[in-house]
């Protein structure tokens, strides 16, 4: 038969109680050391005997470091799990204040839109009227300011466009002058290469063809100048020889 569960209760015998405490204490310290080494855990063990004697073990360099870490963790844990009741009460009061302010603002907005005016007195209506006039004046002032700024910006753009237009116009005039200069230069070069107009070269008549006419082969008399050919002979100089022989016969 297996053993049943051991019932834990206080040892009445003082000596047995001290012996058991000593054994269990050493075993507990040993187990704490083993878990700190095997599992790389931070372990802190504090034991007080019945006589108030302190026995402790710390895997950290100091027991105080582990205790401070424990206190920080415990405080943060309590802050999350146990919210402050005073803060809750303050939140409730603040919610009521904010809600009343919101209701007042919504009511004022509706009155500015001309709604829910039945409950207002004459004085309240006058105040509302002054408020609307002030708002309208402020709106008009802001509108005029924006219009002036817009006009000023447009004037600046207009001035900039005019300057750009002037620059482009000057560039076009410069290019036009360059083109005209190139055209004039080309014309002058063409005129210089063309020969000047001169009188036509006279066409010389070919030399007369010699004939077998006996009259032309006779010697001239001494002292007699050579006779000039008649116009008919000059004209006949261009005729073929056989025509010349026929004419002389």
Swiss-Prot record:
Main site of residence? nucleus
Q: What segments bear the compositional bias annotation Polar residues?
A: 210-236
This chain's protein is named MADS-box transcription factor 18
A Pfam family reported for this protein in Swiss-Prot or TrEMBL? SRF-TF
Q: Where is the K-box domain?
A: 88-179
What is noted besides the main data?
A: Plants overexpressing MADS18 remain very small in size and flower at 105 days after germination compared to wild-type plants which flower at 140 days after germination.
User: Which compartments does it reside in?
Assistant: Nucleus
Q: Which organism is it from?
A: Oryza sativa subsp. japonica (Rice)
Domain (MADS-box) spans 1-61
> Which GO MF term does the entry hold, naming one?
protein dimerization activity
| Entry keywords, A to Z | Activator, Developmental protein, Differentiation, DNA-binding, Flowering, Nucleus, Transcription, Transcription regulation
Q: Which domain of life is it from?
A: Eukaryota
The keyword DNA-binding appears for this protein: yes
InterPro entries linked to this entry: MADS-box/MEF2_TF (IPR050142), MEF2-like_N (IPR033896), TF_Kbox (IPR002487), TF_MADSbox (IPR002100), TF_MADSbox_sf (IPR036879)
User: Gene symbol?
Assistant: MADS18
Q: Is Transcription given among the entry's keywords?
A: yes
């Amino acid at each position: 038969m297996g053993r049943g569960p051991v019932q834990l209760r206080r040892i009445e015998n003082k000596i047995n109680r001290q012996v058991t405490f000593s054994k269990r204490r050493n075993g507990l310290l040993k187990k704490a050391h083993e878990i700190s080494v095997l599992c790389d855990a931070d372990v802190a063990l504090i034991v007080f005997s019945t006589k108030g004697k302190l026995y402790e073990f710390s895997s950290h360099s100091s027991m105080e470091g582990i205790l401070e870490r424990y206190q920080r963790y415990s405080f943060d844990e309590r802050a999350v799990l146990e919210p402050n009741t005073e803060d809750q009460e303050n939140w409730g009061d603040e919610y009521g204040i904010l809600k009343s302010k919101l209701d007042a603002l919504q009511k004022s907005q509706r009155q500015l839109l001309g709604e829910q005016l039945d409950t207002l007195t004459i004085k309240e209506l006058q105040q509302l009227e002054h408020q609307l006039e002030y708002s309208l004046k402020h709106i008009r002032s802001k509108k005029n300011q924006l219009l002036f700024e817009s006009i000023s910006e447009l004037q600046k753009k207009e001035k900039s466009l005019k300057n750009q237009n002037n620059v482009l116009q000057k560039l076009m005039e410069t290019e036009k002058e360059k083109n005209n200069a190139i055209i004039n230069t080309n014309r002058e070069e063409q005129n210089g290469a063309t020969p000047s107009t001169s009188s036509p070269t006279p066409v010389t008549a070919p030399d007369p063809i010699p004939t077998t006419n006996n009259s032309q082969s006779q010697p001239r008399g001494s002292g007699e100048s050579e006779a000039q050919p008649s116009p008919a002979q000059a004209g006949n100089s261009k005729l073929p020889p056989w025509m010349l022989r026929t004419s002389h016969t």
